[in-house]
């Protein structure tokens, strides 16, 4: 297969892919040394990433914020179907959504990570790079995902698609970190994965007695929406950012006026993610029963009304993938997904079956997870294809056989050959398991009332609290660390200085803000929470 045959363009109309060819990665690994991948291209212009730039301490940049790599050329048609290896529909549905996440796919096709990866053990970024490249270069075929993708997670039974999705995203984020060096959590939030999927919540508490204000910032990789009383995603978002009144037993103990007074708590998005993962909370935490109701979601979503800063223009996101669960509880049923290929056509991805469908069909599903991308990001990454190569008609040579992992591995030194595939799975299992991943997630689990709304007890006045991401990239002895914090507030009396088991404090020297009402304290402190 020539280099040109890997890049498909123009209009490719078809109604259904059945199992034309089934390729197994362990067999394909033996051939890994032939066809080259797309050439690396210059990095494209602006990207929008501004996670707490004015608040966070200086951190080591693990990925340049303004330089997300773009592949100069990539397939424009839909890629391969995925073989179900037994209760792996949740894995297949998640992988298809990630494969059609343009910033991630273009980064994988640029080969930037695999060319510099020095991890001695299994690397999720390298494994995902091989999978995404293989899937996109195998249109009309069915491929078998590598066992290493779910090693440590799959236990031979149906799993939750959202858990596997975030397990994979977290593993990729971990792979961005230098394994042999200690990295502070501020630097962890500069990884490429966080730049794509990450944003930051802002919870602002205003004392209605003295008008003192305290802000809490909490990073996120996905947003969970309560749909009990919502008929649409917009309603769920409106409920999420609706100001909450704190009074009576829930009155706020203000650190400025030192009174237990009524207050308002407003939750907004301080920074927006390039790719927005919205999780509709359909399953109960205990019994796993499903809330089977229709919740409307738009093809285009303006997130500006939910942002902290309201003086800018629309912030438009476009839908590009939908995860659907069919069944009555999280313990049964199956998962499938809908994805939008780069030319704009929607496809239903149901394991091995790839079916063309309309946007009307996509918007009529009982969605579980929704994937939105900033419109500007979609256009920027889509344009990288047309700049790289002119579209051409589909030729017979393109449908003879799929591109195998063997052909695609020449520039993937981190991947293993077939005889070492079992070791690859074993190493992946040793590095991260579902139970190890779930432990810190349970400690930081989003409760129905959303823990980003949780009011910190007796916060000092004008404190900025920044929580560490709940998606931790490592654990010591598999237990969450509890660290004490020291408050250095020159404006407070020693009797007001309390020890808080919430994290490590980093003060903002010289940072001031305009006082409101009786608030005459000009210095603010930054409380960074584990």
Curated annotation (Swiss-Prot):
Assigned protein family: Belongs to the peptidase C19 family. USP17 subfamily.
Protein's UniProt keywords contain Phosphoprotein: no
Gene Ontology CC: one annotated term: endoplasmic reticulum
Claim: Nucleus is one of the keywords in the record: yes
GO BP annotations listed: protein deubiquitination; regulation of apoptotic process; regulation of protein stability
Compartments in which it is found: Nucleus; Endoplasmic reticulum
Pfam families per record: UCH
GN (gene name): USP17L4
PANTHER family registered for this protein in UniProt: INACTIVE UBIQUITIN CARBOXYL-TERMINAL HYDROLASE 17-LIKE PROTEIN 4-RELATED, UBIQUITIN CARBOXYL-TERMINAL HYDROLASE
Annotated Polar residues bias: 495-510
Protein name (Swiss-Prot/TrEMBL): Inactive ubiquitin carboxyl-terminal hydrolase 17-like protein 4
């Amino acid at each position: 297969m020539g280099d040109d045959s890997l890049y498909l363009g123009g209009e490719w109309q078809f109604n259904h892919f059945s199992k034309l060819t089934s390729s197994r990665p362990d067999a394909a690994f033996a051939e890994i040394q032939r066809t080259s991948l797309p050439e690396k291209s210059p990095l494209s212009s602006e990207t929008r990433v501004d996670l707490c730039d004015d608040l966070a301490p200086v951190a080591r940049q693990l990925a340049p914020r303004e330089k997300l790599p773009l592949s100069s050329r990539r397939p424009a048609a839909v890629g391969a179907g995925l073989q179900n290896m037994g209760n792996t529909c949740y894995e297949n549905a998640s992988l298809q959504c990630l494969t059609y996440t343009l910033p991630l796919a273009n980064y994988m096709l640029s080969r930037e990570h695999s060319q510099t990866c020095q991890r001695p053990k299994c690397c999720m970024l390298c494994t995902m790079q091989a999978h995404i490249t293989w899937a996109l270069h195998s249109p009309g075929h069915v491929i078998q995902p590598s066992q290493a993708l779910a090693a440590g997670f799959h236990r031979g039974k149906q799993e939750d698609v959202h858990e596997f999705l975030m397990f994979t995203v977290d593993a990729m984020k971990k792979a961005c970190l230098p394994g042999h060096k200690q990295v502070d959590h501020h630097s962890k939030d500069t990884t490429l994965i966080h730049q794509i999927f990450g944003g930051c919540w802002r919870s602002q508490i205003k004392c209605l007695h003295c008008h003192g204000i305290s802000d809490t910032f909490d990073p996120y990789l996905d947003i969970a929406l309560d749909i009990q009383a919502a008929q649409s995603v917009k309603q769920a978002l409106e409920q999420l950012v609706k100001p909450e009144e704190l009074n009576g037993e829930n009155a706020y103990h203000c650190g400025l006026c030192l009174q237990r007074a009524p207050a308002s708590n407003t939750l907004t998005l301080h920074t927006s993610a390039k790719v927005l993962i919205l999780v509709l909370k359909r399953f109960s935490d205990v019994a796993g029963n499903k809330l089977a109701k229709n919740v409307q979601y738009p093809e285009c979503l303006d997130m500006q009304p939910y942002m902290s800063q309201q003086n800018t223009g629309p912030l438009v996101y476009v839908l590009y993938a939908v995860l659907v669960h069919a069944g009555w509880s999280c313990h049964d049923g199956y998962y499938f997904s809908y994805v939008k290929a780069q030319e704009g056509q929607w496809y239903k991805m149901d394991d091995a079956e790839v079916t063309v469908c309309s946007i009307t069909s996509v918007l009529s599903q009982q969605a579980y997870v929704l994937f939105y991308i900033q419109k500007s990001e979609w256009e920027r990454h889509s344009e990288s294809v047309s700049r790289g190569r002119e579209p051409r008609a589909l030729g017979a040579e393109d449908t003879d056989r799929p591109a195998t992992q063997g052909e695609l591995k020449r520039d993937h030194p981190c991947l293993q050959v077939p005889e070492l595939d079992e070791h690859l799975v074993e190493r992946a299992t040793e590095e991260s398991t579902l139970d190890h991943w779930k432990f810190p997630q349970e400690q930081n689990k989003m409760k129905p009332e959303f823990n980003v709304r949780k009011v910190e007890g007796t916060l000092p006045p004008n404190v900025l609290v920044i929580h560490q991401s709940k998606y931790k990239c490592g654990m010591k002895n598999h237990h969450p660390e509890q660290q004490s914090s020291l408050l250095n507030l020159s404006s407070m009396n020693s009797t007001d200085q309390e020890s808080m088991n919430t994290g490590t404090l980093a003060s903002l020297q010289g940072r001031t803000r305009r006082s409101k009402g009786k608030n005459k304290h000009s210095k603010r402190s930054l409380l960074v929470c584990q």
